Amino acid sequence: MEQREILQPHGMKFMTGDKVFLDTNIIIYAYDLSAGEKHKKAKKIFAELWDSGLGVISTQVLQEFFVTITQKIPKTLDKRLAKDIVSDLLKWDVVVNDGESIIEAIEILIRYGYSFWDSLIIEAAMRGGAGVLLSEDLSHGQIIHGVTIKNPFKTEPFSL
């Protein structure tokens, strides 16, 4: 099944040693067959991160992914398959949000003007040691506390 294949190594490597934090939308596009070019690009990024071992996510990303992929995209995934994907993603570096994360996210919200949830994603990327945060929802090229935000769909060809 194509949707499970992207969880397997594909022999591609990132050019950087930086850990890469994936925002929920990138993972969703990797599984959303109706996403066209974004699906293809996200699938490639996702496979490269599996191979490199540089992928970082958070509990928030896993929660948002499960809800979106099983309820909100045009062709939803079966809940058991989505559960298996979440289980596989737990093999990545997973940042667990705690009280300190919430306070730091609020500081990011105050300083940079992002929503609380986006600020929590940025905080998780920082806490997870990521040098790059891939998201289509945040300001491409902005650097926050050493984390560079990149929109992989904004530039062609995309590179870290």
Where are the model-predicted features located?
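Short beta-strand segments at enzyme active-site cores
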Residues: I57-T59, L134
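Acidic, PIN/NYN-like endoribonuclease modules and their adjacent C-terminal/linker elements
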Residues: M1-G17, I122-L160
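Short, well-structured N-terminal submotif of metal-dependent ribonuclease cores
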Residues: M1-I57, K72-R80, F158-S159
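Acidic catalytic patch
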Residues: T59-Q63, K83-R111
